[in-house]
Every structure is written in C-alpha cells, then in structure tokens.
C-alpha cells in the first residue's frame, strides 16, 4: 500500500467570483470524490461539510489498519469496509489487520523500541490499534449524526498518540 495524500476539501465548488467565464469553467455540478471515500449523504444532495471530511478520514483509518481499499473486489453485494471491520471488532480484529501493523510482526533483529519489554509493547500497541479502529468506525458511520465532530476526532487522535510511547518524540 502506498502513501496517501488527502484533500477532501477539493470536493467543493471552486468558484467564488461573479464572472460568468470563471463560473462556467470552474463550476462543479455537485461534490466530487473517490468512490468509497466520499460521504454517502453527498449522493442525496447534502451540502459539503466537515462531516463529509470526518467520514473520509474514518475510511482512510480503516483502510490503513486492514490494508484494503474500500473499492477492493471483496467489498460487493452490500459488504463494505465499515461492515467488514465492524463484524470483527474488537474480539477478532487481529484476524483482519494488515499483518505489517500487528504487534509481533517485525523484522529479525528489530527492537520493540523504548524501555518497554516486548509483551508490554505489544499490549500498548494493540490498545492503540483498537482505539484507532474504534475511531475509524465512528468516523465512517453512514449518517453524520452518528459521527464525532472534527474536534472530537482531533482530541482522540492526540490521546492515542500520547498513550503510545513509541510515537513520542
């Protein structure tokens, strides 16, 4: 999986001038975005909002954790990334995680980091993964009223970072 750069704000209409030339060349009919990442409410005519960005962020978190895109061929017949993760959360989450992020997957000779013994590191890392998964699920809920605010998302990500010593400094 390659690196991703997201700018969900580009889904907005680009025009803000009164010029008809600018309007005709930059006006978008509706929100644009990639299938699987764009908030479902945009398909029903909802206005662009931070809730849509929260949804997209949640999808990216889940994608990062399980190593599958929301457009993966396995997601068909009503199964989508959210449901796939939700079915396994939290008891069977390790079974669907991208093996490269599962604590215990490390190259030979790689240090666990810090002063923690390996088991403590594994426990702390899995706690971080569980919290990130929960946040990804909350953010990618189908309706905006079920999603956290962007401020809540920021606070949660900050708390997760602070709880995981390997991410410090």
Walk through the language-model features, giving the residues of each.
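Cytosolic eukaryotic protein kinase-like domains
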Residues: 1, 5-169
């Amino acid at each position: 999986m390659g690196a991703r750069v997201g700018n969900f704000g580009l889904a907005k209409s680009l025009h803000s001038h009164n010029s008809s030339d600018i309007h005709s060349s930059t006006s978008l009919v509706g929100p644009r975005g990639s299938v699987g990442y764009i908030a479902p409410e945009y398909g029903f005519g909802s206005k662009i909002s931070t809730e849509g960005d929260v949804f997209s962020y949640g999808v990216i978190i889940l994608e990062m954790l399980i190593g599958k895109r929301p457009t993966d061929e396995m997601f068909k017949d009503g199964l989508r990334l959210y449901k796939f993760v939700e079915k396994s959360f939290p008891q069977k989450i390790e079974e669907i995680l991208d093996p490269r992020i599962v604590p215990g997957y490390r190259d030979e000779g790689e240090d666990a980091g810090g002063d923690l013994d390996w088991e403590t590191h594994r426990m702390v890392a899995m706690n971080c993964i569980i919290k990130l998964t929960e946040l990804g699920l909350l953010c990618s809920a189908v309706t905006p009223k079920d999603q956290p605010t962007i401020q809540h998302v920021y606070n949660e990500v900050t708390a997760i970072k602070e709880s995981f010593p390997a991410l410090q400094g």
